[in-house]
From Swiss-Prot:
Protein's membrane topology: Single-pass membrane protein
Superkingdom per UniProt: Bacteria
Subunit details: The 4 large subunits of the cytochrome b6-f complex are cytochrome b6, subunit IV (17 kDa polypeptide, PetD), cytochrome f and the Rieske protein, while the 4 small subunits are PetG, PetL, PetM and PetN. The complex functions as a dimer.
Record lineage: Bacteria, Bacillati, Cyanobacteriota, Cyanophyceae, Synechococcales
GO cellular component, one term: plasma membrane-derived thylakoid membrane
NCBIfam families in the record: PRK00665.1
Protein name (database record): Cytochrome b6-f complex subunit 5
Protein localization: Cellular thylakoid membrane
Species of the source: Prochlorococcus marinus (strain NATL1A)
Major subcellular location class: membrane
Cross-referenced Pfam families: PetG
Length: 39
């Protein structure tokens, strides 16, 4: 049996992690598209 606390932590961390990755990727894409000579 999976502990309810562990299950809650996983269910809470997964969306936050995906959201963080999406936001960082979006910021990098927007930054590179707005400033082509960023590198």
């Amino acid at each position: 049996m999976i502990e309810p606390l562990l299950c809650g932590i996983v269910l809470g961390l997964v969306p936050v992690t995906l959201l963080g990755l999406f936001v960082s990727a979006w910021n990098q894409y927007r930054r590179s598209s707005s400033m082509p000579d960023w590198e």
